[in-house]
Amino acid sequence: MAEASPQPGRYFCHCCSVEIVPRLPDYICPRCESGFIEELPEETRNTENGSAPSTAPTDQNRQPFENVDQHLFTLPQGYSQFAFGIFDDSFEIPTFPPGAQADDGRDPESRREREHQSRHRYGARQPRARLTARRATGRHEGVPTLEGIIQQLVNGIISPAAVPSLGLGPWGVLHSNPMDYAWGANGLDTIITQLLNQFENTGPPPADKEKIQALPTVPVTEEHVGSGLECPVCKEDYALGESVRQLPCNHLFHDSCIVPWLEQHDSCPVCRKSLTGQNTATNPPGLTGVGFSSSSSSSSSSSPSNENATSNS
């Protein structure tokens, strides 16, 4: 009578961190197909039925993120140390190795001793989150909630003191001052407002009150009305016989329109010439030597007033 083949002993896979039944005859892990396995002592073998406990992977026995591609969690250089540093020794992920549901009272000292011998024999691995067996009912005090994990991540990214060893500055991937960015829905409006406030007090100084009062007042003629001349400030057409103020550049304005402007800026709103005849306009960069056609056209449009002023004199 042929004898039954001996049952393989219980082994521990250091890659999967679970107990397995090795694949014979190569003695490799049936899950990861690696040979980094260790035979367990015989005193923990189930002697009631003489067979090794079932090691078929179930949903509760599977390691967290077992089938997730590890490249999905690839972090920039330096961030991996920060991410794993958050999950320190106080963070423990509850897992259930094979047989934990049926034998929760297994001696924890033997398991710690086995892990210690394994690390001593094969060399210490890089620090990582500890995986310890916990009961299915109730939450361990050291296990944080999902909200706590997210809060730790947010605090670590925002707080400069939480990422001292990244070498990326207190704001991580932001390689400049965070105030240089437009944050939120009104961020762009805030930047435009700041720019306008910076240019509010720029430009030529106010004109002298004596020069403003000395500006001549001329009547609007039929030639002005026929040419469609209008006030450059309020854009209203001049009425026949209306009194307007004439600047040295021959541009005509309503008295109520040009006086408040000259009290703040000593320049013509059209050609940017001051009351002394000096041009206060500045050409944009790269346009040096290029004249403004609007000034010449505006001057030409006001030529009838000049002729009229000459004839009246």
Curated annotation (Swiss-Prot):
SMART domains noted in UniProt: RING
Pfam family, one: zf-RING_2
Low complexity bias: start-end ranges: 293-313
UniProt entry keywords in alphabetical sequence: Acetylation, Cytoplasm, Metal-binding, Nucleus, Phosphoprotein, Transferase, Ubl conjugation, Ubl conjugation pathway, Zinc, Zinc-finger
Origin: domain of life: Eukaryota
The protein's enzyme class: transferase
SUPFAM superfamilies to which the protein is assigned, alphabetical: RING/U-box
RING-type Zn finger ranges: 231-272
Effect of substituting C13A: Loss of interaction with EGFR and FLT3. No effect on E3 ubiquitin protein ligase activity but alters specificity for 'Lys-48'-linked chains
Gene Ontology biological-process entries: cytoplasm protein quality control by the ubiquitin-proteasome system; negative regulation of epidermal growth factor receptor signaling pathway; positive regulation of double-strand break repair via homologous recombination; proteasome-mediated ubiquitin-dependent protein catabolic process; protein K27-linked ubiquitination; protein K29-linked ubiquitination; protein K48-linked ubiquitination; protein K63-linked ubiquitination
CC annotations in GO: cytoplasm; cytosol; nucleoplasm; nucleus
Conditions for induction: Up-regulated in B-cells that undergo class-switch recombination (at protein level).
PTM summary: Ubiquitinated. May undergo autoubiquitination.
Self-association and partners: Interacts with CCDC50, EGFR, FLT3 and SCAMP3. Interacts with BAG6 (via ubiquitin-like domain); required for BAG6-dependent ubiquitination of proteins mislocalized to the cytosol. Interacts with CDKN1A. Interacts with AICDA.
Function: E3 ubiquitin-protein ligase that mediates ubiquitination oF target proteins. Depending on the associated E2 ligase, mediates 'Lys-27'-, 'Lys-29'-, 'Lys-48'- and/or 'Lys-63'-linked polyubiquitination of substrates. Part of a BAG6-dependent quality control process ensuring that proteins of the secretory pathway that are mislocalized to the cytosol are degraded by the proteasome. Probably acts by providing the ubiquitin ligase activity associated with the BAG6 complex and be responsible for ubiquitination of the hydrophobic mislocalized proteins and their targeting to the proteasome.
Protein name: E3 ubiquitin-protein ligase RNF126
